[in-house]
Amino acid sequence: MIEQSIDNRGVATLVLARPEKHNALDAATMDALTDAAHRLGADPDVRAVVLRGEGPSFCAGGDLGWMRAQMQADAATRAREARRLADMLWALNRMPKPLIGALHGNAFGGGVGIAAICDMAIGVPGMRMGLTETRLGLIPATIGPYVLARMGEGRARQIFMSSRLFDAAEAVDLGLLARVVPPEELHDAVENEVQAYLACAPGAVAAAKALALDLSGAVTPEQVDHSIAVLCAQWETPEAREGIAAFFAKRPAAWVRQKSA
């Protein structure tokens, strides 16, 4: 789930609050973030939104129990659950308030997708990030449009297919993080960004964000629908069944090849 607070300046803070699960995304968390994006976006008193994670990780991606349930579900259920994640990303991305991400620890899969829809994200040294879906026989489909929009095709293809982990410094080079600061400076770095927005006209900020999305060739509903369709198709493959089964059995998947001696 998430925790939410709004201070007397109109700065809202959303906290991914499943630290024991490394803030993995389950259905309840996705729905809560979608609802928060709609409510905060419609609240004229809210000037900026900060998103962070509680505990050792920012967001470890999809919840393992949720993923296991998808493996056992029918096609219609999988499509509905993919739409749930897509709706969350769409709502956060289109929220007419500046969204500032404060990242630490691990950010995998959907956690990278959340970072990609932040108007800016700040990280700390020692982070590990990655699109790890292909290790499971899946693809980073639903988050894909936002990752491509953030990084551009050339940079995204460096990490989109290999499930390779990368650190905060590389995330800056990829365009995913704006900058990296020491952990003890993360709060102040985010606060500096918030203060900049508090000096701006809120209606103009919302209009500028909408214009940036429109001029950039922003993610479209058609792209979202396509990402859901290809993810559902991938779930039906033998690779997906093998990858998920191997993960929960804590064994290498059938396609894993070790480095030559």
Predicted region positions:
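Crotonase-fold acyl-CoA enzyme core
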Residues: 90-203, 237, 242-245, 251
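Conserved phosphate-binding and hydrolysis motifs of nucleotide-dependent enzymes
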Residues: 17, 23, 55, 61-63, ...
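Terminal peptide-recognition signature
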Residues: 14, 18, 32-33, 51, ...
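Conserved CoA-thioester-binding segment of acyl-CoA-metabolizing enzymes
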Residues: 1-54, 90, 187, 261
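Helix-loop "lid/cap" segments that line or gate small-molecule binding pockets
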Residues: 159-160, 211-215, 229-235
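Terminal low-complexity tails and localization/encapsulation signals of metabolic enzymes
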Residues: 1, 245-261
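Catalytic-core regions built around general acid/base machinery
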Residues: 36, 84-95
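Glycine- (often His-adjacent) and acidic-residue-rich active-site loop
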Residues: 53-88, 107, 219
